[in-house]
Amino acid sequence: MATLIKKPKLRAAGIVFRFAHRGATNYATLLKHYRAVFKMPQPVVSRLTGFSPRSVAKLSEGETPSSKQEKALVEMDRLLDGLSRVMEPAQIGHWLKQPNQAFDGSTPIQLVERGEIDRIWRMLYDLESGQPG
């Protein structure tokens, strides 16, 4: 019985890593950055992206994500950028897990899991524009 071995995806020369603005050169250093700067342990990354804990662990070890996984990482990265504009980055991991009256007692991470991330984006818009919430 033949064993299928996944070959790592190669990047074309000269193409900049999509998350280079985070100081990351690969997905392992990107996830390390999230843990350090945003205080987001692996379970939080797992819940925000919808990845299994095992998938997050593999990415942390340097595995290249699928295009679907990369899209989820981009969406999470955009959310972290938005949240960083209204709070200290080191508070984000904690904030994501706290029940919030603005979200009817749900935690922001629960909103993401339920597909209601638009409620977080609306809150960010209101905070940044000075609109009453």
Task: Name every feature range the model reports, one short phrase each.
Residues 1-133:
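Non-transmembrane "mature" sequence context
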